[in-house]
Each structure stands twice: as C-alpha cells, then as structure tokens.
C-alpha cells in the first residue's frame, strides 16, 4: 500500500522550476490531470527541476505517468521522449515510449538516502513529450488511479475551501462567459467567473488565436454588442502573433468590475445539487495544485463550450448530427452519427535573415509533392477530428493536428520543390490548444433547427441576431481521398438572413437555474453552423447576464423570464450594457450571409 511514509508523488505542475515545459489542463476531464508538455517545435525545451525530501534510507521504484503520443499513426520511434534524473544521475529508461494511452511507465529502482534530493526531467527533442506526475515508492505494485494517489500522498485539504455565495456563477471564460459576467455585474449582481485557463477569451485568446467573426449591434436589439467592442481585439486574423489577441485587454475588462470575483486556473470538476433539478454550487479544482474550492450560487450559466457544467449537473446533452427524422432538416443525414465540426490546430512561420533548419522527421505522415501544402500559415481549414469524439478523444485530436503540421513543414523544408523558398523560414508558432467548434450541446426549452433558419420562422422571444451562414464544415474532398484521417476542411455554406435566436435556447430545460451561452446552447448540429461564431456567442452571453440579474431582482428562475418577464428583458436588450461612446473597433470579418459563397466543398 502506498502511503506518505513509503511514497513520494511529484506532480509536474508543482515542480520548483518548470523550465520550458508547459502546464496544460485542457484534457483534465478525461486524464484527471494537467499535462506537462515539451512544446519546443523541434528544439528541446529547458529542463524541469524540483526538490523533494526522503524520510528514511531505502530503495525506491521510479514511475512516470506518460504516453506515446505518435503511436496511433506511426510505428517509428516516437519523438515525444525524455529522461528523468535523480541527484544528477539519469535512469536508463527513455520515457514516453510506451502505450498511446496515459499509463505509468516504469523507470527502475533508485537508492535514496534520507534528506533532500533533486529530480530533473530532460526533454530530448522538443516534439511534445509529456508527463503528468512522477512517483517514487517502496511499494512494488504498479501505481493506480492518479486522483486517488494525489488524495493519499499529497497534503491536500480534505474539504474544499469555501469561496462564498454569489448571485450568479459563470463557468467558462471565453467571450460568452466574459460578457455574461460583466453584464450581470454592471447591473448589480455579485458574480463569480471560473475559468480553467490562465487567460480569458477562449478561442480568441493568444493560446488558440481565432479572430472574431460575425456582426455586433444588429437586429431588433442594436445595442447588444457594444460590450464585446470594449474588450475585443482591434485587429483581425487567425494564427497571428500573440499581441493581436490582446489578452491583457480582456483580463482588464474582468478586473475592472468590482462585482466580479475571478477564479482563473480552476476547472469545475463536481457540482452540489439541491434536488435533481437545481444547482446549489460547484466544486472547482486548481489546475496546478489540485486543491479544491467550493463556489455557491443562485443562478449559473454554462459557457464552457463543452457543456461541462450541464453534464455534471445531469442535464440532457447531444453530440453529433441528428437524423432527418428528428427535426426533418433537409440537410440532415438519414441516421444519427457522431460527426461534428472539427477542431483547428493553427500555426505559422516567420522569415529570418539567415537559413533555419527543421528536423527531417521519419515518424510523421507520409507527405509528397502532390499532397504537401505550400503555405506559411495553417489557419481555420487545418481542421481535424470531425469523426472523433470531441471529449473522450480530445487529446488525440489535438495531437493529430500537431502531427500533420510537423509532417507538412518537415517535408516542405527538407524535400519539397519549394524548399529553397523556405530556407529562411522558421516554424515559429503552433497552437497546443485545440480550437474547437463543436462538441456537446445542451437541451433548452427550444431547439433551434435548420428549418427555422431557412424558413425564417420568427418567434416572440427572439433576442440575439445571427450574422453568419449555416457554415457546416466537411473534410476537403481531395485531402480525404489521400489520407485515412483528413486534416484539411472546407465550408458548406447556406446563405441566410440575420435571424433572431429564441431566448429559450439560452436556458436549460432540466436544470431550472442554469443558463447557457456559446457553442453549447440549444441548437441542432446544423443550426450551430450559424450561431457558433464568437461575436454571436458574446451577445448571447450579454443577454444571459441581463437575464441572470433579472432573476436576482425578481426572485425568479430563467424560465420565468420567458413566461412572465420577457418585456423587462427586452427593455434591457434595447439599452445594452456596453459603452456606445467607445471607439468602434469591431468592423472586420463581416460577411454578406445572404450571398452565395463557396469554400471548395
């Protein structure tokens, strides 16, 4: 049995010096941890180093929780490898070479004296080797569940730390969650916003780098959108330099609101229910320390994108494409499938004054002169995972996006007919955060469908206006012919007029005090194609924040706003909560959605 007296657990997120290793929590729902990633773009990253104490002399088994990330696609030796050393002496095992799944890889025995010691993790390639935790134990059995080990071997509090009670709890800090939090706060609610990243903005942050799309200040409620204009980036573009996305402006917008308490770097991992249909609070786990906090509230909103809060609370959710029999949508498949819009893994190169080398890899996708992409930037159409589970296989999807980017760039630089043109180009940035478009969607009291949009069926509770096509991505036909797993996409675009989304799509049918805003609202797969762009999501959040504050003022539930108080919400939507006198910057990526346009499908 592993105890504190015979075992030492060293989570990578708690290392004294992480060196060049990145702590990434985006897969915590599945792997139960943040991963430490050597994301050096082909150049080994600086060592991660930590100290630890041993109580008594002894021989310890060394285990590392890791995975072989290229194993799903290549039987060549993986590049995701690293070494582990104790007190300056590395063990013989090369880590990261085992299973494609997270597992404990054995590193042999280490003799340790009582007292202080140092452990070092040395990356070998810069190609995304990864680990979670390192375990030194005198127990001879293989380690088990990582969450149980943390609870037994780390000095974690046994009870979540109480962070108080709030009028409105926002889970998710993309533009939808930000607007929901700020809107409610400005109207008088005490708000908590919980965000598992260290930055705000979601897909529009410097971690993912998707430019804002769609229109603000349109439709019946033309004041909706001034709020996003206050903190949205002034410049357009996908896969640009980090400064374009103005993370500091977004952080400042949240910090400026005295009614908002921000919990960044916390992921909601459990819920506290009052009966089967009412949320009373959430348990959030620090993505570095694994300490838990408790946040109680009256009204909640799921702005996670993945419907994480709703799923924990037991709300009904869907993923994939509904069959034609469900809503009689003309573009729906005959039978339900798990196909979703994909995730983009973006990248770019930069021109240098001197030639720059890039490894000639043998473990990558087989690229040739016919399939190589002659480009210095991979943006939205570098899209993967349409046939995979966007939750359970999220890491595999992200990894495949990186795998093909490395493969294409290596061939382009070292073998292609264009290689002389690329001699001075350096592979400068590759996102390790998947830019998701779709995963789980929650059910509200109304599900918006393709028919509503095409037939322009207007409902009395219309609120936020769409401003995008029905933009349903598919694998690029030529790419799909050549590769078992396509990695380029195209858009199948259906022209639309601006359409007012029913308010009933923004609150949950099962959890009576929960709103939704963003890409996990109550729509069909096809309808998601127009509501999912970020400026539309932001206005959804703004409306949800207004409605949440009305719930506080009136002592009611989200459903009651629709049934009994929609006129009050309408008055708020006419006013908006943003400042209309600020310079108007959101004039880019505005498209004519009524025009016929093709993206090569």
Say what each PLM segment does.
Residues 165-167, 187-190, 258-261, 297-298, ...:
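Loop/turn elements at helix/coil->beta-strand transitions in domains of secreted/extracellular proteins
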Residues 177:
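N-terminal Rossmann-fold NAD(P) dinucleotide-binding loop
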Residues 162-174:
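Beta1/beta-strand and adjacent pyrophosphate-binding region of the FAD-binding site
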Residues 1-160:
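Extracytoplasmic
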Residues 157-159, 203, 265-268, 275, ...:
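Flavin (FAD/FMN)-binding glycine-rich loop and adjacent Rossmann-like elements that form
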Residues 183, 189-190, 195-272, 277, ...:
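Conserved N-terminal/central alpha/beta ligand/cofactor-binding core
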């Amino acid at each position: 049995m592993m105890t504190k007296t015979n075992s030492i657990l060293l989570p990578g997120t708690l290392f004294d010096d992480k060196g060049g290793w990145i702590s990434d929590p985006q897969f915590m729902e599945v792997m139960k941890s943040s991963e430490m990633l050597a994301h050096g773009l082909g150049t080994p990253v600086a060592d991660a180093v930590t100290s630890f104490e041993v109580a008594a002399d002894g021989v310890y088994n060394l285990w590392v929780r890791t995975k072989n990330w290229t194993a799903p696609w290549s039987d060549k030796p993986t590049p995701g490898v690293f070494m582990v050393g104790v007190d300056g002496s590395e063990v013989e095992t090369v880590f990261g070479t085992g299973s494609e799944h997270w597992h404990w890889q054995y590193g042999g025995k280490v003799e340790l004296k009582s007292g202080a010691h140092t452990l070092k993790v040395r990356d070998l390639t810069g190609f995304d080797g990864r680990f979670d935790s390192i375990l030194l134990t005198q127990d001879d059995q293989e380690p088990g569940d990582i969450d149980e080990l943390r609870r037994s071997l780390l000095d974690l509090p046994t009870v979540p730390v109480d962070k108080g009670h709030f009028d409105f709890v926002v889970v998710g800090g993309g533009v939808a969650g930000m607007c929901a939090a700020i809107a409610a706060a400005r109207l008088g609610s005490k708000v908590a916003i919980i965000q598992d990243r260290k930055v705000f903005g979601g897909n529009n942050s410097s971690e993912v780098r998707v430019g804002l799309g769609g229109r603000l200040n349109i439709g019946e409620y033309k004041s909706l959108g001034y709020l996003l204009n206050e903190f949205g980036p002034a410049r357009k573009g996908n896969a640009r330099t980090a400064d374009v996305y103005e993370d500091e402006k977004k952080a400042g917008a949240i910090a400026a609101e005295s009614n908002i308490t921000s919990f960044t770097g916390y992921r909601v991992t459990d819920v506290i229910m009052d009966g089967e249909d009412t949320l009373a609070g959430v348990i959030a786990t620090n993505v570095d320390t694994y300490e838990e906090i408790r946040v109680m509230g009256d009204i909640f909103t799921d702005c996670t994108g993945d419907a994480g809060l709703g799923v924990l609370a037991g709300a009904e959710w869907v993923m994939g494409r509904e069959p034609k029999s469900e809503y009689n949508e003309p573009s729906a498949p005959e039978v339900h499938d798990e196909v979703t819009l994909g995730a983009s893994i973006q990248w770019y190169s930069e021109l240098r004054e001197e030639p720059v080398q890039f490894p000639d890899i043998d473990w990558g996708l087989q690229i040739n002169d016919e399939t190589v992409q002659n480009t210095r930037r991979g943006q939205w159409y570098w899209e993967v995972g349409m046939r995979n589970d966007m939750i359970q296989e999220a890491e595999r999807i992200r990894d495949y996006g990186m795998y093909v980017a490395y493969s294409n760039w290596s061939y382009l630089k070292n073998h292609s007919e264009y290689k002389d043109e690329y001699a001075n180009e350096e592979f400068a940035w590759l996102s390790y955060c998947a830019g998701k478009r779709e995963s789980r969607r929650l059910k509200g009291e109304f599900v918006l469908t393709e028919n509503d949009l095409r037939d322009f069926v207007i409902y009395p509770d219309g609120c936020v206006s769409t401003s995008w096509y029905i933009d349903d991505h598919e694998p690029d036909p030529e790419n799909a012919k050549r590769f078992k797993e396509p990695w380029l996409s195209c858009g199948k675009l259906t022209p639309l007029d601006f359409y007012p989304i029913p308010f009933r799509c923004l609150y949950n049918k099962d959890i009576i005090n929960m709103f939704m805003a963003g890409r996990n609202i109550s729509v069909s797969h096809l309808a998601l194609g127009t509501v999912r762009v970020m400026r539309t999501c932001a206005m959804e959040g703004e409306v949800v924040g207004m409605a949440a504050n009305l719930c506080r003022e009136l002592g009611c539930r989200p459903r009651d706003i629709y049934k009994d108080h929609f006129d009050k919400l309408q008055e708020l939507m006419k006013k908006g909560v943003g400042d209309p006198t600020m310079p108007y910057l959101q004039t880019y990526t505005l498209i004519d959605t009524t025009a016929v346009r093709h993206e090569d499908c």
